[in-house]
């Protein structure tokens, strides 16, 4: 009979099989009421599943991350319950959990309108408020197939036929008259599923294959309580205000058009931001002793066959032909960097060799996945490749980590989650090589006092990697930085150096990206700052305005003086009211507005205002220039009044 060990080390002895709910009730009615599921020997199970042998048990509640995920999964089933009541002939496909919520793909003989979605959400609330029990039954494969075949659920039958072994026992979850199939676990009662909202609908092909039928995907969000739901909806509202596509149009940064899907047309102000980012990155490359190179954007298909990209990546590559040769427009920079490394004999004394490029890359992303600057087809990578010996890996990774944090801190990103992906089952190289490589990455992180979590088995077949995910002001995650070891590509492309023993050896290659795609990072920054770029990055840093025509000459003199001081400045001499000008440039998020009236001309000063509406009063021109230069030079995130 089972002995149940709880997280605090205490044990409970039973003379019969028990469920997590039984144990929770044994501990106390409060825990039983909060119990959503259990974790038995590390595996999530339903609250009703029986434990027959000795086991470690944790009770899962809505306060746990897993508990929230279960709530969201059960809300997907609730959606299925509601839609079958409203439109009984609907065929249900799949309804998984996603970040912050869930979705369900359905085959429906009508296109859902906003009114339909509102009616569906209303029915979901009506059902959830009944607080009915969710009943789980484990049945044979044949019984499950018969259940769904009798209900006309052809997609569920297809899942059973193609994805579930005949000797398996699928879990069926009954929501009153509605039944769904899932591995689980799910909530034991719908009282846990009161705080949700349906968000939008979209099209989705069955099994993600464009040859299959287009289904309707209904997205929803779900949370453990009303406060969390409202906070999330408020974040979404704020995110909509910060949408880089909207701000990009308002500030005239860039545009995109149908004739070039996923390609960016940079306007002057947007390109100014892009070039400032390049200047910043170049300054760091120099500080961390990188060479900057430039490879061709198109190379013969034969080279991509050697690297393995053609076999594994060709659908995402653009190709063209000339003189009976097929060329691939590069989706990444690494093969070109190996070609540069291969020019001339290399010695161990030449290593490490750090090679960086602002590489123009193209990937044939599906048109439906394109999203402003965040997901494009043509982009510029700020990546680099380090060629080194195995003994140099730790020091080089250390340098990469310092560079990552050095650059992210400049933009004010403080919350960074780090993951270390280890060896997969299918891999190249010896266990000893992987042992050392993984240890080098882990020690480098530890030496920099960086907490991290392992992603076991998630590394590439050619080496382990570190991923850096930064979180913005709305707590959204953006995976940008990577440090990836590669034991394969240098060998495939015949890279070598002469070792200390005079023998030819294959270098280790470290792929290093920090910003990732420059376009995407500008999109991230646009939303992070809501268009209020720090002064050093702002396309126009200062606008100087006159009140009447009599100050025009003074404004022009000051404009030239600030420009000569390296400040991006414009003069606004339009015959408009000063209040109108200030409002317009405030909406354009120009960091500083200098106003010149007769008093300023007489005193040789300027009246200084910020885009946040702060009046800094009258200041000496040279003082303004000196303070602005300091703010720009230091790449400060704060303005003068802060």
Curated annotation (Swiss-Prot):
Q: Where does Zn(2+) bind?
A: 334, 385, 511
- Start and end residues of each TGS domain: 1-61
Q: Does the keyword RNA-binding apply?
A: yes
Q: Which organism is it from?
A: Shigella boydii serotype 18 (strain CDC 3083-94 / BS512)
Q: What family, per the record?
A: Belongs to the class-II aminoacyl-tRNA synthetase family.
Question: What CDD domains does the database record attribute to this sequence?
Answer: TGS_ThrRS (cd01667), ThrRS_anticodon (cd00860), ThrRS_core (cd00771)
- Protein name as catalogued: Threonine--tRNA ligase
Q: Which gene encodes it?
A: thrS
Q: Where is this region: Catalytic?
A: 243-534
User: What PROSITE patterns does this protein map onto?
Assistant: AA_TRNA_LIGASE_II (PS50862), TGS (PS51880)
A GO MF term: tRNA binding
Per the entry, what this protein does is: Catalyzes the attachment of threonine to tRNA(Thr) in a two-step reaction: L-threonine is first activated by ATP to form Thr-AMP and then transferred to the acceptor end of tRNA(Thr). Also edits incorrectly charged L-seryl-tRNA(Thr).
Q: What is its main location?
A: cytoplasm
What quaternary arrangement does the UniProt entry report?
Homodimer.
Q: How is the cofactor bound?
A: Binds 1 zinc ion per subunit.
Keywords, A to Z, come to: Acetylation, Aminoacyl-tRNA synthetase, ATP-binding, Cytoplasm, Ligase, Metal-binding, Nucleotide-binding, Protein biosynthesis, RNA-binding, tRNA-binding, Zinc
The first-level EC class reads ligase
Q: Provide one Gene Ontology cellular component.
A: cytosol
Q: What's a GO biological-process term for it? A: threonyl-tRNA aminoacylation
Question: What SUPFAM superfamilies does the annotation carry?
Answer: Class II aaRS ABD-related (SSF52954), Class II aaRS and biotin synthetases (SSF55681), TGS-like (SSF81271), ThrRS/AlaRS common domain (SSF55186)
